[in-house]
Amino acid sequence: MSFDLPVPVLLAIMRLNERGHEAYAVGGCVRDLLRGVTPNDYDICVSCTPQETHVVFAGERVIDTGIQHGTVTVLLGGMALEITTFRADGEYLDGRHPASVRFTRSLREDLRRRDFTVNAMAYHPVTGIVDLYEGEKDLKKRLIRCVGDPEQRLTEDALRILRAVRFASQLNFDIDGDTARTMHRLRDRLHLVSRERTAAELIRATAESGAVPALGEFSDVVFAALPDFPPLAWISGLKALSHLPAGDATLRMAALLHDCGEPALQNTLDSLRQSRAFREEVLALCRQARQPFAPDETAVMLAMLGEVQLRRLVRLQQAAGVLDEKESAQRLARIRAALAADLPLSLRDLPVNGKDLTAMGLAGEEVGDTLHTIHQMVLRGRLPCDRAAIIAWLTRQKK
C-alpha cells in the first residue's frame, strides 16, 4: 500500500535516508491516510538524534521545539514538520510524564510506547506500513485499543483516558472492552492531570460528531474530570448535544452545560481553565437557553450578543426543545432582517452622542442613561434612527 505524501514530507524522509538514518511518517497522519482522510499535519520519527537532524537540514530553519524529548521542527517547502528521535520512555512517577526519555535506534521500541494501536503505525514511501500492534485491523473494526497492557498505558499518563474518549468521538469508533473497563477503573487518576490538559480533551471530544455515544458511555470519566457538573443535568445536556452539528466548540459545550444551573455552571466553566472569551460566551448562552426572546427584542439581543452568538442561541434553544423548528426559522429570519435594516447595534452608531445631549442641557449620569434609553427605543422600533427625530424627541422630553 502506498500513499501520495506531500513533497516536503517526501523530501525530508529522503534527505534523512540519504544520510543513513531511518525515517518514517508516524502516528495520526498514518491513521488518517489509511482512513482516506487528508492529515492536518505530518510527524516524522527518525533513528538519528536531534543534533544529527540539525546537520541533515543545515541551511533550513530548524526549531528546537521539544529537544529534551527528541523533537525539532523543520520548516521545509512551506510545511512545519515535527521530527522526533525514536525513543523509549522511562518510568512514569507522577501519572503524567516519564521521569526520563531514552533515545533509541529501534522503531519497534518507539511504537511500543504509544497510546493506541491506531496511532502506533509508521509509513515509509518505499517499504510501506509498519504495523506491529494491529492498528490497521482496529481501524477496520472502528476500535480504539491501547497498545499492549491498558493498565500500564493508562497508568503511565492518565490523560490517555480522556484521549480515548476524544478519539472515539472524533472518529466515531468504539473503545475496546479491556481498554474501556480499565478507563472506568482508573478514572479517579484524572486528578493527577492539569485542568488545562483535561479541558482541552473534553472540549475537543464535545465538539466532534461522535460526542453523544462517547460521552454517554463514559459519563463517570467526565464527572471525574468535572466534579462540579451536576449529574441531573447530564441527560438533558446530551440530548441537546445530539441535535446540533459538529464543529462549534462553544455552542456544543453550551448545549452540554445548559441545564447545570448556578453555581455549578460557573464552577464547571472555571474548572475548564479556558480563555475568558470562551467562558463568557458559553455562560451567556447557558443563561439565555431557557428564555426565548420576543419578536421586538431581536435587534436588542443582536446588540447585546452579536450576530454569531445570537445565531448560536437560537440553535441552542431549538436543540434544548425551547423552540420548535418553525420558531427557530422565524427567529433566524428576524436576525437577517435586523441586520439588513442597518440598525445601530452600539451606542457609537447612533446619530447623536454625549456632546449633543450635553449641549441640550443634560449632565452627568443623565447623559449615559438617556443615550441608553434612545438606543433601546431605536432598536425596538419605537424611535426612528434619525438625528432630527431623536433631537425632536429629546426636546419634547425636556418640556
Which residue stretches match the model-derived regions?
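Catalytic cores of the polymerase beta-like nucleotidyltransferase superfamily
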Residues: 1-399
